[in-house]
From Swiss-Prot:
Gene: NFIA
Record remark: domains: The 9aaTAD motif is a transactivation domain present in a large number of yeast and animal transcription factors.
Modified residues (Phosphothreonine): 471
Identification of the protein by name: Nuclear factor 1 A-type
Statement: the UniProt record of this protein carries the keyword DNA-binding: yes
């Protein structure tokens, strides 16, 4: 659900940053140890041995603090989503000790009961929310089936859905008290490995092979009492600590962080982590009316109440935090004045776009434009050579006339026919798309045929001997009928002459 990469910007949410120092480091070891044991049992159909379990425990305890904090950040993000929006502020204030404990209600499941979540990625075991709260903030080693051992305080008004850690307790039964005495007594006389019996216990055994009374209690875990108490009280932000200071984060005033120390450098994130970050952002947009406490003086990198630009960051585009904290990112570092102007522009719900054909991932602030400016700039250096420029307004008429000027003139004046009667030469239309074709072959040599030239007078006036029109030429033409005035120009074959129904003709009269 959340990015498995290093701490991305969605994991710097003020909700997470305020609660992260209060998470016990033992929670990471405990949840992962239970998952390892369950996976081993499903694969080998037998329980993990003490040596193997102890090796897994030592491996988890020696894990890097950054890995533990990333896991805690993802789990806190899941818990934030399961807490009702109107109770999230109270949850942060009560856990951090800035407000008396009050009920914090969670979103119920379909049956109206406490929800269950998986605390690890791709885990098949689910845990109740109240169990997770107790393990996470109190470090109590509870199993996933210990939900009935939890009790709510009398001050809790809604025991069914309240996930306030200060309202949740663990009931200790008589068996627990009874076993605690013997286990503690055995632990005080033994080393850090309670499963290894001491020499005194071996000597006290009867000769007939029966075990002593104290040896009937077998410690199933690999933690001793003192070790368990010690590791359960260690916060997850202790030890070597993270590579950033939690007090340097931009947040609201109720986090009691210094407003002057609001500068930190974010690790550079690739476009892949930005794309995956959008998936986690979508889960936070389904709860309207949330974040009533994000209206402080400073603006958190993950807060989405003051500007919608945090939810609208596209892959490959710099977020407001990336533009401000660009010491380690791929973008060039802007000046303080440019940083303030860019931050103001982001709060006005503008989305930056990198325009122009020369835009590169390493863009400077001068290439960042907003929708108020023209999107399309002047053309770049591409296709600027005059030899390869092409204007769509130019036609191929000049090209045809250049290749075969005679054919171009004949094609525009006389239509010649092939033996099949289909037209090949037509008048060139500059408005129609002309394909790039070779010039047509020259027309066949036709025998000169005298074309009848009609008189300007009707045929009846020529028989009456009337005077001809002065503008009409005086030719002696044989008398022909009007039907024979349609003449076809074709090859020398006489069968194609004067056959109007088979060829294309022009009216010359």
């Amino acid at each position: 659900m959340y990015s498995p990469l290093c701490l991305t910007q969605d994991e710097f949410h003020p909700f997470i940053e305020a609660l992260l120092p209060h998470v016990r480091a033992f929670a990471y070891t405990w949840f992962n140890l239970q998952a390892r044991k369950r996976k081993y049992f499903k694969k080998h159909e037998k329980r993990m041995s003490k040596e193997e379990e102890r090796a897994v425990k030592d491996e988890l305890l020696s894990e890097k603090p950054e890995v533990k904090q990333k896991w805690a950040s993802r789990l806190l993000a899941k818990l934030r989503k399961d807490i009702r929006p109107e109770y999230r502020e109270d949850f942060v204030l009560t856990v951090t000790g800035k407000k008396p404990p009050c009920c914090v209600l969670s979103n119920p499941d379909q049956k109206g009961k406490m929800r269950r979540i998986d605390c690890l990625r791709q885990a098949d075991k689910v845990w109740r929310l109240d169990l997770v709260m107790v393990i996470l903030f109190k470090g109590i080693p509870l199993e996933s089936t210990d939900g009935e051992r939890l009790v709510k305080s009398p001050q809790c008004s809604n025991p069914g859905l309240c996930v306030q850690p200060h309202h949740i307790g663990v009931s200790v039964k008589e068996l627990d008290l009874y076993l605690a005495y013997f286990v503690h007594a055995a632990d005080s006389s033994q080393s850090e490995s309670p499963s290894q019996p001491s020499d005194a216990d071996i000597k006290d055994q009867p000769e007939n092979g029966h075990l002593g009374f104290q040896d009937s209690f077998v410690t199933s875990g690999v933690f001793s009492v003192t070790e368990l108490v010690r590791v359960s009280q260690t916060p997850i932000a202790a030890g070597t600590g993270p590579n950033f200071s939690l007090s340097d984060l931009e947040s609201s005033s109720y986090y009691s962080m210094s407003p002057g120390a609001m500068r930190r450098s974010l690790p550079s994130t690739s476009s892949t982590s930005s794309t995956k970050r959008l998936k986690s952002v979508e889960d936070e947009m389904d709860s309207p009316g949330e974040e009533p406490f994000y209206t402080g003086q400073g603006r958190s990198p993950g807060s989405g109440s003051q500007s919608s630009g945090w939810h609208e960051v596209e892959p490959g585009m710099p977020s407001p935090t990336t533009l401000k904290k660009s010491e380690k990112s791929g973008f060039s570092s802007p000046s303080p004045s440019q940083t303030s102007s860019l931050g103001t522009a982001f709060t006005q719900h503008h989305r930056p776009v990198i325009t122009g054909p020369r835009a590169s991932p390493h863009a400077t602030p001068s290439t960042l434009h907003f929708p108020t400016s023209p999107i399309i700039q002047q053309p770049g250096p591409y296709f600027s050579h005059p030899a390869i420029r092409y204007h769509p307004q130019e036609t191929l008429k000049e090209f045809v006339q250049l290749v075969c000027p005679d054919a171009g003139q004949q094609a525009g004046q006389v239509g010649f026919l092939n033996p099949n009667g289909s037209s090949q030469g037509k008048v060139h239309n500059p408005f129609l798309p002309t394909p790039m074709l070779p010039p047509p072959p020259p027309p066949p040599m036709a025998r000169p045929v005298p074309l009848p030239v009609p008189d300007t007078k009707p045929p009846t006036t020529s028989t009456e001997g009337g005077a001809a029109s002065p503008t009409s030429p005086t030719y002696s033409t044989p008398s022909t009928s009007p039907a024979n005035r349609f003449v076809s120009v074709g090859p020398r074959d006489p069968s194609f002459v004067n056959i109007p129904q088979q060829t294309q003709s022009w009216y010359l009269g």
